[in-house]
Regions:
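Cell-envelope/extracellular polymer assembly enzymes that use nucleotide-activated donors
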Residues: 4-6, 181
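Short beta-strand/loop segment that forms part of the nucleotide-sugar
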Residues: 9, 21-22, 30-40
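Short, well-formed alpha-helical segments that are part of the catalytic scaffolds
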Residues: 13-27
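Acidic helix N-cap motif at the loop->helix transition within catalytic regions
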Residues: 16-20, 42-51
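Conserved donor nucleotide-binding strand/loop of the catalytic core
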Residues: 31-34, 45-80
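A conserved acidic beta->alpha catalytic loop
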Residues: 37-46, 93
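Acceptor/aglycone-binding surface of glycosyltransferases and processive sugar-polymer synthases
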Residues: 59-61, 65-73, 97-176, 202-214, ...
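Short beta-strand-to-loop acidic/aromatic patch adjacent to the donor-nucleotide binding site
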Residues: 80-94
């Protein structure tokens, strides 16, 4: 049986890029694209709807809040419409949505539980990953391997996971620690984890987190806090 795949895109003020992201998603693979509008003040929701996405709103600001809203939407669908696999994808066009094929393949073919799209293993455009992101990824993934025994190379947001496994993780983070919480909990629960190389380019528009010193410090602190929280 062909699995149902739902894509969740948290989005805050991504009017320039959101249509491009949605248009590049392989429609033959995906049953629904859900854009979680996180209090955008621009044309993000209208552009997402015009591109064919389902748009839902989350007024509480935070990447994790938006992702949790998307999960709730997926979980509450009727049994015959409920997705088997959730793909998380950012709305800034830094990832390559067409690589969803490679991202979901280990789940479908090898019964893997969670797949992380690794920019470290893939091809990142020069300057797309800021120095603080590269450094933070290296430190965080080494700590996860040391403390939880699972080797990752990236904490990137482009990822796929079985819905039943995602619900089992009982995700709670509402801000910067979202991706690392998922990986740490998956490692702790002994989920079957793997990574696939993905491409990465400079985002459209300015980064809301890594592009500022204060954002980078807050994100780094939250990531470290989350890694140690679940020991």
């Amino acid at each position: 049986m062909t699995p149902k795949i739902l894509v969740i895109i948290p989005a805050f003020n991504e009017e320039e890029s959101i249509g491009k992201v949605i248009n590049d998603i392989p429609k033959e693979l995906v049953s629904e694209v859900v854009v979680v509008n996180n209090n955008s003040t621009d044309g993000t929701p209208a552009n997402a709807a015009s591109a064919g996405a389902t748009v839902i709103n989350e007024v509480r600001m935070g990447y994790g809040y938006a992702c949790l809203k998307g999960i709730s939407y997926a979980k509450n669908k009727s049994e015959n419409e409920r997705p088997d696999i959730i793909v998380f994808l950012d709305g800034d066009y830094s990832d390559y949505p067409e690589e969803i094929r490679e991202l979901i393949r280990p789940i479908i073919e090898d019964n893997i539980d969670i797949v992380i799209g690794s920019r470290t293993l893939g091809n990142a455009e020069k300057g797309a990953l800021l120095p603080q992101q590269v450094f933070g990824n290296a430190i965080a993934t080494k700590l996860i391997k040391w403390l939880y025994g699972v080797e990752f190379t990236d904490l990137g947001p482009f990822r796929a996971i079985k819905l039943d496994k995602l619900l089992q993780l009982n995700m709670t983070d509402t801000t910067y620690g979202w991706t690392v919480e998922m990986q740490v909990k998956a490692a702790k629960e002994k989920f079957k984890c793997t990574e696939v190389p993905v491409s990465y380019r400079k985002r459209i528009g300015a980064s809301k987190i890594a592009g500022t010193i204060s954002g980078s410090i807050k994100a780094g602190y939250k990531i470290l806090l989350t890694i140690f929280k679940y020991l």
